[in-house]
Amino acid sequence: MTVRKNQAALTADEKRRFVAAVLELKRNGRYDEFVRTHNEFIMSDTRTGRRGGPGHRLPLPFLPWHRRFLLDFEQALQSVDSSVALPYWDWSTDRTVRASLWAPDFLGGTGRSSDGRVMDGPFAASTGNWPVNVRVDGRTFLRRSLGTGVRELPTRAEVDSVLSMATYDMAPYNSASDGFRNHLEGWRGVNLHNRVHVWVGGQMATGVSPNDPVFWLHHAYNRQLWAEWQRRHPGAGYVPTGGTPDVVDLNDTMKPWNDVRPADLLTHTAHYTFDV
């Protein structure tokens, strides 16, 4: 069984193996396929805040969709090195630019002030190993501006305030909704998930956010929070369950796979566990 660990607890060898597997996926072209898929199916409508993609019903089921997306990526990593698991970044604890994940032996740090170019670590442009091929502009290098777009990452108190919400979601099931899903996604309230994307900056603040490997650690933590919410609220079911216009319901299939439903992805226990 795969165990997803807090990145702060990774050994030097676990970091090295994770980075090596990510770089191999980049080298063989599979990594950019994930970036392309995300850019196609997770796009923000600046007028409504809803997310979706060409030919996809809106809004897309944020938590189940990303659970499958991360499972596919984790399996791709394990096809390179079976010992690798996706680590998660608890940004409510590791909240500064000095956190261990930004070290040169792991993800590298923030970008330079002139253009955001990441200058250290294995994904810096100077290594020649990380060209940004799926992009929203002409810049071909990884960019970050840690703590510039928004000053503070979410606190544990803010996380707990969202975990305390007893309802998973409610109509109209979009960026205007109340409930756990929308507050975790970050369209309302303390803006958890979305705020982290903006805090990192660079490609993380765009539809091609998987260009930054921290994307996977961020979303792995979102899945951990979903699992924690489910433990706190065992009687709260997933909604919407059916017959909802312009929404992917519980038993609807999700693109791009077309063979998996939110109902198939409500629990992680068949696929992995967490170290907490």
Swiss-Prot record:
EC number(s) given by UniProt: 1.14.18.1
Top enzyme category: oxidoreductase
Highest taxon of source: Bacteria
Annotated binding of Cu cation A, by residue: 38, 56, 66
Task performed by this protein: This is a copper-containing oxidase that functions in the formation of pigments such as melanins and other polyphenolic compounds.
NCBIfam families named among the record's database cross-references: TyrosinaseMelC2
Name of protein: Tyrosinase
UniProt source species: Streptomyces galbus
